[in-house]
Amino acid sequence: MSGFSLEKFNFVLLFPVLSLLFWAIVLLLLDAFKKLSRNFYIGASIIALFSTLCFLLIYNGFVLDNSHAFFDLFVSDNYAIFAQIVILVFSMLYLLMDKDEQKAEFFSLFLFMIASLILMISSTNLIVIFLALEGSSLALYTLIALRGTHNAISSSIKYFTLAAVGAGFFVFACAFVYLKTKSLDLDNLLHSEYISDPILLCAGVMFLVIVGVKLSIAPFHFWLKDVYYGVHTNFIAFISIVPKIAMIIVVLRIFSALGGGVKFEYIVALLAIFSMLAVSIVALIQKDVKKMLAYSSITHSSFILAVIVSSMSVSSQGDGTSYLLSIFALFVYWISFAFANYGIFLILSLFQKSSFESFSGLFDQRPVLSIMLAIFILCIAGIPPFGIFWGKILILASILNSGYYALVFAVALSSMIMLYAYLKILIYVFFKKAQIVESANLDVKQKIILCLCLIGSVSCVFLLL
């Protein structure tokens, strides 16, 4: 083949994926031949993640930036590189803060899932995105079910069933895109003469189903509450943050390609408004902190969807500066939420029960822990001067700049409704009559991570400047 060249493969770009897959296979084989301690598997997994992170930090801007691999099936741009770094950092934080006894295959599946997430955000080809999406999803279903309890298995099956329906819609959407454009590459779709075709609008609506499932946007969120109640508390923090980061990048790529001529952003805006308002009202009547936080994560995902609507609008207008503002607002908001969310669930993992009443009078018994919990709660509520407040200001500025005033009103109203739900737990912690609270103690690693989460949730916006 005269046109064949090894340079077109560009294996350097795929090193993060290949490295994590190698470590996943090694850990799986080690478990088959010799039973090793849990600490060994945690250490090996962290080494795998950290070495991949170092590679990204060292080679960013030298080899990876705006380069392609495997005949343009994979791309490495600034958004993908930054998202990969965030995924690796919060994956390591999860492994360090988790004290639950996990089986050896858990860590192999965990690395396989992270590799699939990185692959998903590194491609602009719909088939590659779909394969990586399903690879990460299959690993996640299994990780949820590995706990072995009835709740864990049933929630995993419910998630699998709903996601399988979403995957079917994704395949149909890909078929529609190929039918009209004769291409499955999103870069080609951006410059397609068929961008205003109604068939592509139908494809966008079908894509929206899998997006709703993966980002847990109402009315595709029914699996989330069961998962929150069925898995280990620290793992809840992970699945509510890390898999969604990869999906957010995919949504940005797909919706930016579809938002040029069919005014697809109107449909996405309506879904975001419905999701954030409906779920905020449901969150008010919850009697369990975990379930309330499940609905809280849905509202935050809806806010992210609102930013994506803004980015779609300004991207179709060719306003590069406003588009960058939208992306910056998205990352500031989600990273601030990630730190605060990790902190909250790390504290919740110390308690056997998660009802509001079980936290009554916690301040009288553990004042420092109560104050830290209050800071994290106020952070996700968007109270100044915490990081999410600045992220939400950037979100509102971005949406205003794109002209979606109804979306701005919906974000503000949803935030006010959720504020009451957040303050409810603080009322129990600080003002309710004290009762005996059964709780464990933080080890040294968890104390360090809790402090890091506190710093990150308060000052994230300044760290990113």
Swiss-Prot record:
Belongs to the complex I subunit 2 family. NDH-1 shuttles electrons from NADH, via FMN and iron-sulfur (Fe-S) centers, to quinones in the respiratory chain. The immediate electron acceptor for the enzyme in this species is believed to be ubiquinone. Couples the redox reaction to proton translocation (for every two electrons transferred, four hydrogen ions are translocated across the cytoplasmic membrane), and thus conserves the redox energy in a proton gradient. This is NADH-quinone oxidoreductase subunit N. The gene is nuoN. One of its GO terms (biological process) is ATP synthesis coupled electron transport. It comes from Campylobacter lari (strain RM2100 / D67 / ATCC BAA-1060). NDH-1 is composed of 14 different subunits. Subunits NuoA, H, J, K, L, M, N constitute the membrane sector of the complex. PANTHER family: NADH DEHYDROGENASE. It is a multi-pass membrane protein. The chain crosses the membrane at residues 9-29, 44-64, 73-93, 110-130, 159-179, 198-218, 235-255, 265-285, 292-312, 327-347, 371-391, 405-427, 444-464. The keyword Membrane applies. One of its GO terms (cellular component) is plasma membrane. It is an enzyme of class 7 (translocase). It catalyses: a quinone + NADH + 5 H(+)(in) = a quinol + NAD(+) + 4 H(+)(out). The keyword Ribosomal protein does not apply. Keywords: Cell inner membrane, Cell membrane, Membrane, NAD, Quinone, Translocase, Transmembrane, Transmembrane helix, Transport, Ubiquinone. Its main location: membrane. GO terms for molecular function: NADH dehydrogenase (ubiquinone) activity; NADH:ubiquinone reductase (non-electrogenic) activity; quinone binding. Its EC number is 7.1.1.-. It is found in: Cell inner membrane.
